């Protein structure tokens, strides 16, 4: 084996799936991600939610769309996620 051989292990990228709740900002969407957690004392399954600002380069996602977001380098002070793909479009009534 060579001592000069550099082996880099690719970090697995964090991805989440959530619903777009706001697209009022330019090139940014707010995604609500909900997860189910078991309560530590009572044992009941409860919903926990978090909002993430994600980068939307072409302003193509609307409120109600279900999207997949991936973590990356910081794009701005509060935005380090980007939209990867559209999972399900919002139903238009």
From Swiss-Prot:
Gene3D superfamilies: Nucleic acid-binding proteins (2.40.50.140). GO terms for molecular function: rRNA binding; structural constituent of ribosome. GO terms for cellular component: cytosolic small ribosomal subunit. GO terms for biological process: translation. Keywords: Ribonucleoprotein, Ribosomal protein, RNA-binding, rRNA-binding. It comes from the Bacteria. CDD domains: Ribosomal_uS17. One of the primary rRNA binding proteins, it binds specifically to the 5'-end of 16S ribosomal RNA. Part of the 30S ribosomal subunit. Belongs to the universal ribosomal protein uS17 family. NCBIfam families: PRK05610.1, uS17_bact. This is Small ribosomal subunit protein uS17. It comes from Bordetella pertussis (strain Tohama I / ATCC BAA-589 / NCTC 13251).
């Amino acid at each position: 084996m060579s001592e000069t051989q550099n082996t880099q292990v690719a970090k697995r990228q964090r991805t989440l799936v959530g619903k777009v709740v706001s697209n009022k900002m330019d090139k940014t969407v707010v995604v609500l991600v909900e997860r189910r957690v078991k309560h530590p004392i009572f044992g009941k399954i409860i919903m926990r939610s978090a909002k993430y600002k994600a980068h939307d380069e072409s302003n193509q996602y609307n409120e109600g769309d279900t999207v997949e977001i991936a973590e990356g380098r910081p794009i701005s002070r509060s935005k380090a996620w980007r939209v990867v793909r559209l999972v399900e479009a919002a139903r238009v009534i």
